[in-house]
UniProtKB/Swiss-Prot annotation:
Higher taxonomy: Eukaryota, Viridiplantae, Streptophyta, Embryophyta, Tracheophyta
GO molecular function: methyltransferase activity
Note: This gene overlaps with At3g51075, a potential natural antisense gene.
Protein known as: Probable methyltransferase PMT27
Family: Belongs to the methyltransferase superfamily.
Biased segments, Low complexity type: 115-127, 176-191
Protein's organism: Arabidopsis thaliana
Biased composition (Basic and acidic residues): 90-114, 129-143, 154-174, 257-320
Residues covered by region (Disordered): 43-362
Length: 895
C-alpha cells in the first residue's frame, strides 16, 4: 500500500484519534453496505484492498483490450489496476470481520452472478468514501493531490468497468466456478497473499502471449522476495513518472500491520506498487475534477500507451530469462537509466539502418527493375578499373604508363555492360583459335594495321587468325619449334610448363603452345592496338589486360619457367633496368628469358645502341646469354638468357648496380606495390621455394612441392603435404561425380574457366584431361597459396573481388566460386560482385557456386533478377551448391 507523502508520520495524536474514529464509522457503514449487497451480488471495488485485488486478478488478461475502449479518461496499465487502497490516512489494519465479510460477499456474488444494481451501489459507496476522505484531506497538505487526481479518476472508472466485465464473464460460466487464480487470493491472508498472486501472475503470463502490461511483473517477483523491493519499486516509479517520495512513505510506516500486508504485496508484485499508489488516491477524485482534467488525462493515456509498447518489446527477453532461472535477484532497470546508458541495440541502430538501406538497394536490384546498362565511353568493352576516365584525368604523369594501369572507381559499378549488336554464341575450341564472329568483337583497325603480319584478317562475317605475329608471320608453331631447336634444354611441356608472354598481341604464341602442353599467361595493355587481348579471349586463349608500368604485376616471385617477349615494345634498358628487374623477380631461378626483337639481329644505329645497353644490363643482373639464333624463314633472331640458380655471381660483382634488395623486402608482395630497381637474392636453403627446379610435367601436377614440410599446417588443418594431396583427391571426386553429371552443365562448349577462389588449385588440376584452361584467382586476403599453384604447373593471379577484374567483358565460359561470396559479404557488397560476374561471363556461360545455404539463396535471387537460368540448387547441412547459365537478356534502360 502506498500513502501520501509522509503525512502519516507527522500527524498529532488528536488528528490520529479523529482519523481512527472516522475509520470505525466508515467500517461500520461498509459492513452495513455489505449486508445490503449480499442479495444483489455487488462487490464494490474500492472498499478493501482484498476485493480490489481479486477483481483485478480476474481481469488481468483483458487489460489490453480494455485499454482501447475509446474513452477520454486515461487508460490504466495492468500495474495501475492491481491493487486499490481505500484508507489512505489510516495506518492501522482493517478489522478481520471486514475482510472476512468482503471475501464472503465475493463468493456469494460469484455464485449468484447477478449484476443488475452493481453500478449504482458502486457509485454510491464511492461518493460516500469521497466525501469522508475529502474532509480529512483538507486538514493535510494537498501539494500532490492535483497531480495524483489527474491520473486516478480514469483508474477508478477503469476498475469499475473491469468489475462489470468480470460479472459478465461470470454469467457465462457455470455457477460457483471462479476464474483461474482467484480462489487462492481469497483464501490467502497476510503474507501468504503475495505468493498466491505470484502464482496467478505467472499462470496468466503463460496463458497470454500478447499481454503487454504484464511484462515486468514476473521478472520482479523473485527480486522483491530477496529484499530488493526498494530498487525495483523505485525503478517502476521512474518509469511511470512518479516521485520516489511516495515509495519512501510506504517504507517509513513499516510498524503498522496494514503496511506489512502492503509491503508483502509490493514484494510479490514489484512493478505494480506504483499503480497501487495511484489506486488508493481514486477515492479523492471528485466529479468536478474529472470534468476539468479531461485533456490532461488524455496526455496521461498517451504516456501509458508508450510505456506499454516499450514493455512489449522487452517481454520476450524477460520471459526467456525467467524461464532459464537467470532472472532471480536482478533488479529492474529504470527508463531513465536506459536513457543515460547506451545499449548495444541503440548503438547498432544506425548501423542496422545503413545496412537496411543497402539491403533495400539489393532488393530493388534483385527484382530486376533496377538493373541498368552502363553508360561508359568504352561501351561494350567496358573494364571498370581500366576505363576510369575520371581517375586517369587526375594523373600527374603518364611517363611510366600509369594511364594503362588499374584505377578502380571508389564505388564499384552495379550496371550491366551491353552486348555488341549482332552478338552470337562464341565458336567452340579449337575452331575458335582460327576464327571468331566479327560482330562479337567488331574491331577492324588491328586487321588494317597488322594484317600483313598475319595477326588478324576480316573474312566475311568472321575475323580469321592465320597464326602469325610480328616475329612469326609464317606461323607460331614454326617459331615455337625454332626456339626449341635453339635451346634443347627448354623442353616444352616437360621442364618448361608455365610461361609469361609479355606484349602478346592476339596471343597466337600462347594459343599454339597448347599443342606442346605448355600454358602461357599472355598480357598486353589496353592501348592503340585495338582489343588485342579481347581477340585472344574470344579465341579461347588465356590473356589479361596489363602493362609493364610503375607497379609490380600481380604474380608471385620465382614462378615462371620462361618469359617471352617478341617485339613487345617494352624499354627494358630504361630507368636503370627497372622493368627487366620486375621480370627477374617473377622468373624462376634457372629459368629463361627469350627476347626476340630487332636489336638482336638488326644493325640500325638505334638497335645497336639498345643492344649495348641491354647487354650491360643483363650482365649486371648475372643473366647468362645462352644463345643467339636466327630464323631464316621468318628473317628474325632470338636471344635466350638464363637467370642464375645461385648467388655466386651476385657476390662477385664489381659494382653493386643494380643493388640487391633489402632483406625485409618481400618479393612476393605484388598487389599495388611500386616497382623497385633492385634484385632479390636466389634462395639457397634446400627446403626453400626456388632453390630447386620442379619435377617435370605432368608429374608435378600431383606431386606436393618439395618445400612443403610435414611440420607446416595446411589450409585444411592437416600437415601441408597431406593437405595438398587430400585437396587434390577431393576435387577429383567432386568434378567426376558431381560437376560432370549432376549439375546440368554441358562441358562441350566450356574452354575459358576461372576458379574465383582457388586454394591449392585442386579444381583446376581435376580438369586436366578436359580441353580447358583455368585462371586460378587467389584472393588478396586469403592465404598466399598461389606459388603452390604455379609449382604444380598451373597458373593464376592475385585479385580482390571487391574490385573489377582486368579482363574484357564476355571473356569466360565458366566461373567457379567455392565459398567465395560468404567471405566477401563481410568486406563488400555482393551486388557489384554479381554485376562483375555477369560482365565476365559470356552469354551461354555458366556459374557454379558452393557456399553456405543462406548465401546460395541470396545469389540465386540475384541471378534470377539478371534473368540467368538457374539449373540446380541443393542444400544440406547448411551447405549448398548452385549452377546457372547466363542468357542474352539486357535491361532496356541506361545510366
Amino acid at each position: 500500500m502506498a500513502f501520501g507523502r509522509g503525512r502519516g508520520n507527522k500527524r498529532t495524536s488528536t488528528s490520529s484519534y479523529a482519523s481512527t474514529i472516522t475509520m470505525v464509522i466508515f467500517v461500520a457503514l461498509c459492513v452495513f453496505g455489505v449486508w445490503m449487497l449480499s442479495s444483489n451480488s455487488v462487490i464494490p471495488p474500492q472498499i478493501t484492498q482484498g476485493s480490489t485485488r481479486a477483481a483485478v486478478a480476474e481481469t488481468e488478461r483483458s487489460d489490453v483490450s480494455a485499454s482501447s475502449n475509446g474513452n477520454d479518461e486515461p487508460e490504466p496499465t495492468k500495474q495501475e489496476s492491481d491493487e486499490q487502497q481505500a484508507f489512505e490516512d489510516n495506518p492501522g489494519k482493517l478489522p478481520d470481520d471486514a475482510v472476512k465479510s468482503e471475501d464472503e460477499q465475493r463468493k456469494s456474488a460469484k455464485e449468484k452472478s447477478e449484476t443488475t444494481s452493481s453500478k449504482t451501489q458502486t457509485q454510491e459507496t464511492q461518493q460516500n468514501n469521497d466525501d469522508k476522505i475529502s474532509e480529512e484531506k483538507e486538514k493535510d497538505n494537498g501539494k500532490e493531490n492535483q497531480t495524483v487526481q489527474e491520473s486516478e479518476e480514469g483508474q477508478m472508472k477503469k476498475v469499475v468497468k473491469e468489475f462489470e466485465k468480470e460479472q459478465k464473464q461470470q454469467r457465462d460460466e457455470d455457477a460457483g466456478t471462479q476464474p483461474k487464480g482467484t480462489q487462492g487470493q481469497e483464501q490467502g491472508q497476510g503474507k501468504e497473499q503475495p505468493d498466491v498472486e505470484q502464482g496467478n501472475k505467472q499462470g496468466q503470463e503463460q496463458d497470454s502471449n500478447t499481454d503487454v502490461t504484464f511484462t515486468d511483473a514476473t521478472k520482479q517477483e523473485q527480486p522483491m522476495e530477496t529484499g530488493q523491493g526498494e530498487t525495483s519499486e523505485t525503478s517502476k516509479n521512474e518509469e511511470n513518472g512518479q516521485p520516489e517520495e511516495q515509495n519512501s512513505g510506504n517504507e517509513e510506516t513499516g510498524q503498522q500491520n496494514e503496511e506489512k500486508t502492503t509491503a508483502s504485496e509490493e514484494n510479490g508484485k514489484g512493478e505494480k506498487s506504483m499503480k497501487d499508489e495511484n489506486g488508493q488516491q481514486e477515492e479523492h477524485t471528485t466529479a468536478e475534477e474529472e470534468s476539468g482534467n479531461k485533456e490532461e488525462e488524455s496526455t496521461s493515456k498517451d504516456e501509458n500507451m508508450e510505456q506499454q509498447e516499450e514493455r512489449k518489446d522487452e517481454k520476450k527477453h524477460e520471459q526467456g530469462s525467467e524461464a532459464s532461472g537467470f532472472g532471480s535477484g536482478i533488479p529492474k532497470e529504470s527508463a531513465e537509466s536506459q536513457k543515460s546508458w547506451k545499449s548495444q541495440a541503440t548503438e547498432s541502430k544506425d548501423e542496422k539502418q545503413r545496412q537496411t538501406s543497402e539491403s533495400n538497394t539489393v532488393e530493388r536490384i534483385m527484382d530486376g527493375n533496377a538493373w541498368v546498362l552502363c553508360n561508359a565511353t568504352a561501351g561494350t568493352d567496358y573494364i571498370p578499373c581500366l576505363d576510369n576516365e575520371e581517375a586517369i584525368m587526375k594523373l600527374r604523369s603518364r611517363r611510366h604508363f600509369e594511364h594503362r594501369e588499374r584505377h578502380c572507381p571508389e564505388d564499384p559499378p552495379t550496371c550491366l555492360v551491353p552486348l555488341p549488336e549482332g552478338y552470337k554464341e562464341a565458336i567452340k575450341w579449337p575452331e575458335s583459335r582460327d576464327k571468331i564472329w566479327y560482330h562479337n568483337v567488331p574491331h577492324t583497325k588491328l586487321a588494317e594495321v597488322k594484317g600483313h603480319q598475319n595477326w588478324v584478317k576480316v573474312t566475311g562475317e568472321f575475323l580469321t587468325f592465320p597464326g602469325g605475329g610480328t616475329q612469326f608471320i609464317h606461323g607460331a608453331l614454326h617459331y615455337i619449334d625454332f626456339l626449341q631447336q635453339s635451346l634443347k634444354n627448354i623442353a616444352w611441356g616437360k621442364r618448361t610448363r608455365v610461361i609469361l608472354d609479355v606484349g602478346c598481341g592476339v596471343a597466337s604464341f600462347g594459343g599454339f603452345l597448347f599443342e606442346r602442353d605448355v600454358i602461357a599467361m599472355s598480357l598486353a595493355p589496353k592501348d592503340e592496338h585495338e582489343a588485342q587481348v579481347q581477340f585472344a579471349l574470344e579465341r579461347k586463349i588465356p590473356a589479361i589486360s596489363a602493362v609493364m608500368g610503375s607497379k609490380r604485376l600481380p604474380f608471385p616471385s620465382r614462378v615462371f619457367d620462361l618469359i617471352h617477349c617478341a617485339r613487345c615494345r617494352v624499354p627494358w634498358h630504361n630507368e636503370g633496368g627497372m622493368l627487366l628487374l620486375e621480370l627477374n623477380r617473377m622468373l624462376r631461378p634457372g629459368g629463361y628469358f627469350v627476347w626476340s626483337a630487332t636489336p638482336v639481329y638488326q644493325k640500325l644505329e638505334e638497335d645497336v645502341q639498345i643492344w649495348k645497353e641491354m647487354s650491360a644490363l643483363t650482365k649486371s643482373l648475372c643473366w647468362e646469354l645462352v644463345t643467339i639464333n636466327k630464323d631464316k624463314l621468318n628473317g628474325i633472331g632470338a636471344a635466350i638468357y638464363q637467370k642464375p640458380a645461385t648467388n655466386e655471381c651476385y657476390e662477385k660483382r664489381k659494382h653493386n648496380k643494380p643493388p640487391l634488395c633489402k632483406n625485409n623486402d618481400d618479393a612476393n608482395a605484388a598487389w599495388y606495390v611500386p616497382l623497385q630497381a633492385c634484385m632479390h637474392k636466389v634462395p639457397t636453403n634446400v627446403v626453400e621455394r626456388g632453390s630447386k627446379w620442379p619435377v617435370n610435367w605432368p608429374r608435378r601436377l600431383q606431386t606436393p612441392p618439395y618445400w612443403l614440410n610435414s611440420s607446416q599446417m595446411g589450409i585444411y588443418g592437416k600437415p601441408a603435404p597431406r593437405d595438398f594431396t587430400t585437396d587434390y583427391e577431393h576435387w577429383k571426386h567432386v568434378v567426376s561425380k558431381v560437376y560432370m553429371n549432376e549439375i546440368g552443365i554441358s562441358w562441350s562448349n566450356v574452354r575459358n574457366v576461372m576458379d574465383m577462389r582457388a586454394v591449392y588449385g585442386g579444381f583446376a588440376a581435376a580438369l586436366k584431361d578436359l580441353q580447358v584452361w583455368v585462371m586460378n584467382v587467389v584472393n588478396i586476403n586469403s592465404p598466399d597459396t598461389l606459388p603452390i599453384i604455379y609449382e604444380r604447373g598451373l597458373f593464376g593471379i592475385y585479385h580482390d573481388w571487391c574490385e573489377s577484374f582486368s579482363t574484357y567483358p564476355r571473356s569466360y565460359d565458366l566461373l567457379h566460386a567455392d565459398h567465395l561470396f560468404s567471405k566477401l559479404r563481410t568486406r563488400c557488397n555482393l551486388v557489384p560482385v554479381m554485376a562483375e560476374v555477369d560482365r565476365i561471363v559470356r552469354p551461354g556461360g555458366k556459374l557454379i557456386v558452393r557456399d553456405e545455404s543462406n548465401v546460395i539463396r541470396e545469389v540465386e535471387n540475384m541471378l534470377k533478377s539478371l534473368h540467368w537460368d538457374v539449373h540446380l540448387t541443393f542444400s544440406k547441412h547448411q551447405e549448398g551448391i548452385l549452377s546457372a547459365q547466363k542468357g542474352f537478356w539486357r535491361p532496356e534502360t541506361s545510366q
